[in-house]
From Swiss-Prot:
CDD domains registered for this protein in UniProt: UDPGlcNAc_PPase (cd04193)
GO BP term (any one): UDP-N-acetylglucosamine biosynthetic process
Disordered, as annotated region: 56-91
InterPro entries to which the protein is assigned, alphabetical: Nucleotide-diphossugar_trans, UDP-sugar_pyrophosphorylase, UDPGP_fam
Residues that bind UTP: L111, A112, G113, G114, K125, Q199, G225, D256, K380
Positions that bind substrate: N226, K410
Residue spans of biased composition, Basic and acidic residues class: 78-91
GO molecular function, one term: UDP-N-acetylglucosamine diphosphorylase activity
Protein's name according to its UniProt entry: UDP-N-acetylhexosamine pyrophosphorylase-like protein 1
Species for this entry: Homo sapiens
Superkingdom, taxonomy of origin: Eukaryota
Length: 507
C-alpha cells in the first residue's frame, strides 16, 4: 500500500491536498481505507479531470449558436420502420435475426450502473417491482425474455442456442445485483452465461475544481455514465470473452425500460442486413418539445443531440409529409458489432467528451460536519453510450412503436410520466392488446362482455387486467392456443406452466 507521504505528494501535484485535511482525526482503519482510495487516483489524470469539470461547468449552457445550420435528419435509406414496413420485409429482418441468434452470434448487454434514487429506493432499479399481478421485477422480465428468444430461435433452426447476458454494474449496484441473481437462481439462466462487470467511478468536483469529500475518510465518487461502458469493456476483457463465445453482434439497452425486447430478432436482423456496425432503435417524438434526445446528423455524421441543445424553432420544423423533421427519439437501445466495439475501446474512447451533470452532492464542511445541500453544489462528469455513433462507418436506425417497445421507469409516484404506474399500465395494456388479437374476450363481474379497446389513450387503463409471461410470448406470438374463442374475467394471468386464470369463466 502507498504511504501517507506518497499519497500526499501525489495529491499536491494534482492540487487536491485538501483531501487529507482530516488525517490527524482518523483511526488506523479509516486511514487505510482513505489511502487505498486515494492511491487509485493518478495525479495527472485527476488534475485534468478537475480542470475539465470546472471549465465545462463555467461554459455557457444552451445550444451552440451554429447548430441549426449543421443539423440534418438521418438519410431515409438508413432508417427502417418496423410498423410501417411491408410484412415480407419485416419477416426477412426477423428471420435473419433468429438465424444469427441460433448461431450463438448475439449477446445482450445491460446498462445497470445506476441506483433507484429517483424512485425513492436505495437498491438497483432492476430489482424494482412496478406492481404487476405476478410481482415480477425488471430483472426477471428481462431474463425471461432472453429465455424465450433463445427458445424461439432454437425451435426455428432445430438447435440449442445461447444469448449471453452481460450486465454492467457499478460499485453501488454490483453486490446487490449479484446477490439478487443468486437468490433467484439466475432466473433459470445458466450462471456461466451471465457476466457481471463494473464500470469506473470518478470523483465529484466543486464548481472551482476541488474534489469533494463525502466523509472525512471517503471521496465522493460517482459512476462515469453509461458511456463508461467502453472503458469497462477493456478493463474487464469483456470483448475477449465475447470472442471466445463467438459473439459478433451486441444489443445494448438500459435497465429501466419495462417493454424492452432483448436480442430483438427484428432489430438484429435489420441491422445485419443493412451491414450496420452501429445502430439505434428510435421512437417518434410525441411532441416537438418532448425532453428526449434526437438521433440525427451533425456535420454529416450520426449523433444524438440532446433536447436542450435544439432550439424551439428547429424542434418545430416539419417534413413534407407533415411529421416532425427531427422526430427520431433516442431510447438507449443500441446495436453494435463486436468489431466496432473493439475499435471504440482501442482507438476512439479517448476522443469522447465528458458531459457535465450538476448535482446535489453530500459533503463534509471545514469542521467535519456532514452537509446535505439543498441546491446543486457539485459536478459529476459522465460519458454517454451514444457518443460513439459518430465513429460508425455504417449507421442505421429502426423506428419502433412507443406503445410496443418503450416505457421507462425513472420517477417515483405520483409523477405523471415515467413512473411505476405508467410502466405498469404500458405492459398490461400491451398484453391486453395481444390477448384481443389472439381472440380472447373479457367479461365484467356480472358476466357481460367488456368493450374491446385495442387502441387506448396514453396512460389509460385497459378494461381488463391481463399479464402474459415472457416465457409464454415474446412479442405476442403463439397466444391463440390459449386464448382463441375463450372468455375470461379480469385478471387473466398467463404463466409459463399453464394458463392460470383466476375466476375463469368459459363461454
Amino acid at each position: 500500500m502507498a504511504s501517507e507521504q506518497d499519497v500526499r505528494a501525489r495529491l499536491q501535484r494534482a492540487g487536491q491536498e485538501h483531501l487529507l485535511r482530516f488525517w490527524a482525526e482518523l483511526a488506523p482503519e479509516p486511514r487505510a481505507a482513505l489511502l487505498a482510495e486515494l492511491a487509485l487516483l493518478e495525479p495527472e489524470a485527476l488534475r485534468e479531470h478537475c480542470r475539465r469539470a470546472a471549465e465545462a461547468c463555467a461554459r455557457p449552457h444552451g445550444p451552440p449558436p451554429d447548430l441549426a445550420a449543421r443539423l440534418r435528419p438521418l438519410p431515409p435509406e438508413r432508417v427502417g420502420r418496423a410498423s410501417r414496413s411491408d410484412p415480407e420485409t419485416r419477416r426477412r429482418w426477423e428471420e435473419e435475426g433468429f438465424r444469427q441468434i441460433s448461431l450463438n452470434k448475439v449477446a445482450v448487454l445491460l446498462l445497470a450502473g445506476g441506483q433507484g434514487t429517483r424512485l425513492g429506493v436505495t437498491y438497483p432499479k432492476g430489482m424494482y417491482r412496478v406492481g404487476l399481478p405476478s410481482r415480477k421485477t425488471l430483472y426477471q422480465l428481462q431474463a425471461e425474455r432472453i429465455r424465450r428468444v433463445e427458445q424461439l430461435a432454437g425451435e426455428r433452426h432445430g438447435t440449442r442456442c445461447t444469448v449471453p447476458w452481460y450486465v454492467m454494474t457499478s460499485e453501488f449496484t454490483l453486490g446487490p445485483t449479484a446477490e439478487f441473481f443468486r437468490e433467484h437462481n439466475f432466473f433459470h439462466l445458466d450462471p456461466a452465461n451471465v457476466v457481471m462487470f463494473e464500470q469506473r467511478l470518478l470523483p465529484a468536483v466543486t464548481f472551482d475544481g476541488k474534489v469533494i469529500l463525502e466523509r472525512k475518510d471517503k471521496v465522493a465518487m460517482a459512476p462515469d455514465g453509461n458511456g463508461g461502458l467502453y472503458c469497462a469493456l477493456e478493463d474487464h476483457k469483456i470483448l475477449e470473452d465475447m470472442e471466445r463465445r463467438g459473439v459478433e453482434f451486441v444489443h445494448v439497452y438500459c435497465v429501466d425500460n419495462i417493454l424492452v425486447r432483448l436480442a430483438d430478432p427484428v432489430f438484429i436482423g435489420f441491422c445485419v442486413l443493412q451491414g450496420a456496425d452501429c445502430g439505434a432503435k428510435v421512437v417518434e417524438k410525441a411532441y416537438p418539445e418532448e425532453p428526449v434526445g434526437v438521433v440525427c446528423q451533425v456535420d454529416g455524421v450520426p449523433q444524438v443531440v440532446e433536447y436542450s441543445e435544439i432550439s424551439p424553432e428547429t424542434a418545430q420544423l416539419r417534413a413534407s409529409d407533415g411529421s416532425l423533421l427531427y422526430n427520431a427519439g433516442n431510447i438507449c437501445n443500441h446495436f453494435f458489432t463486436r468489431g466496432f466495439l473493439k475499435a471504440v475501446t482501442r482507438e476512439f474512447e479517448p476522443l469522447l467528451k465528458p458531459h457535465v451533470a450538476v448535482k446535489k452532492v453530500p459533503y463534509v464542511d471545514e469542521e467535519g460536519n456532514l452537509v446535505k445541500p439543498l441546491k446543486p453544489n457539485g459536478i459529476k462528469m459522465e460519458k454517454f453510450v451514444f457518443d460513439v455513433f459518430r465513429f460508425a462507418k455504417n449507421f442505421a436506425a429502426l423506428e419502433v412503436l412507443r406503445e410496443e417497445e418503450f416505457s421507462p421507469l425513472k420517477n417515483a409516484e405520483p409523477a405523471d410520466r415515467d413512473s411505476p404506474r405508467t410502466a405498469r399500465q404500458a405492459l398490461l395494456t400491451q398484453h391486453y392488446r395481444w390477448a384481443l388479437r389472439a381472440g380472447a374476450r373479457f367479461l365484467d363481474a356480472h358476466g357481460a362482455w367488456l368493450p374491446e379497446l385495442p387502441s387506448l389513450p396514453p396512460n389509460g387503463d385497459p378494461p381488463a387486467i391481463c399479464e402474459i409471461s415472457p416465457l409464454v410470448s415474446y412479442s405476442g406470438e403463439g397466444l391463440e392456443v390459449y386464448l382463441q374463442g375463450r372468455e375470461f374475467q379480469s385478471p387473466l394471468i398467463l404463466d409459463e406452466d399453464q394458463a392460470r386464470e383466476p375466476q375463469l369463466q368459459e363461454s
